[in-house]
Amino acid sequence: MAPIRTKDKHKNAEASSSKSNKSHKKKPNHQPKASALPGKQKIKSSLRQVRRLLAKENLAADKRVEAERRLKALEAELQQVEQAHKERALAIRYHKVKFFERQKVTRKLNQVKRRLDSADGSEKEQLEAQLLEERVNLNYILHYPKTKKYISLFPPEVRKGEVTEASKTDAEKTNREREEIRQWIRDSMEKKELPSEPETQLGSGPGRPQASTQFPSKKSSNPVTKSGVQSSKPGDDIEDDEFFGNDSEDDGNEVEDEEDEDEED
């Protein structure tokens, strides 16, 4: 009678069992992050706990004082987090339109500077005034208030010359708001809170000086949403817009696109 090889069968059984176990191993469960706003939910949870504590009638006086201080600190922290996330969202949303406008303004500014080299008399005065306006425009783009929806320097109706009756009211309001911010930029430049020659600091990244004062907010003013400037998807067609590439004297030195340029300041 031939011998029975039980050892090989045992090995085969073990191999089969190990393969089965491997195939049935649970794959790691990659849960998506609960929130794209890190820290916000934790702060809100802490706020609820503190408010529940303060709601107790028999809470000791010293504990109440401590809880009230904690409440104020948490509320301030939550406000900072929400503001930071609002700034980030707006920076991402308007990155493209601000980039192309910065290119346009920088080219115009360089053209004026070249013309100034050979100008004199009244022409020189006009060019100096124009140079100041272009520098205001450049600071406008670089240092626009971070918590406000961006109002374009060159809205679609200006770029394409299409002004309808329906858009006139919106355009008037938008123009007023734009000019208010430009005036704030001028004042900040006069106070040395913003650079008088912003073109010399392009590409300096996080080291770029920022306005030391914030643009005064108006609680009653609502961002314009009807005009083309404040569309839900700003800048979608801006890459193909000839307006941003039709300068008569292109100096060939276009501004390079930096990673997280304006919004990461």
UniProtKB/Swiss-Prot annotation:
InterPro entries cross-referenced by the UniProt entry: Efg1, EFG1_rRNA-proc
Region annotated Disordered, chain positions? 1-46, 161-180, 185-265
Provide ranges: composition bias, Acidic residues. 237-265
Q: Which Pfam families match?
A: Efg1
- Give the record's GO CC terms: nucleolus; preribosome, small subunit precursor
The alphabetized UniProt keywords are: Coiled coil, Nucleus, rRNA processing
Which residues lie in Basic and acidic residues bias regions?
185-195
This protein's major location comes to: nucleus
Bias-annotated ranges (Basic residues):
21-30
Q: What domain of life does the native source organism fall in?
A: Eukaryota
Compartments, as annotated in UniProt = Nucleus, Nucleolus
Q: Where is the composition biased (Polar residues)?
A: 210-233
Q: Which Cys residues form disulphide pairs?
A: none
Q: Name one GO biological process term.
A: maturation of SSU-rRNA from tricistronic rRNA transcript (SSU-rRNA, 5.8S rRNA, LSU-rRNA)
| Coiled-coil annotated spans | 55-121
**Tell me, what does this protein do in biology?**
Involved in rRNA processing.
Family to which the UniProt record says this protein belongs: Belongs to the EFG1 family.
Question: What is the designated name of this protein?
Answer: rRNA-processing protein EFG1
Instruction: Tell me what organism the protein belongs to.
Output: Coprinopsis cinerea (strain Okayama-7 / 130 / ATCC MYA-4618 / FGSC 9003) (Inky cap fungus)
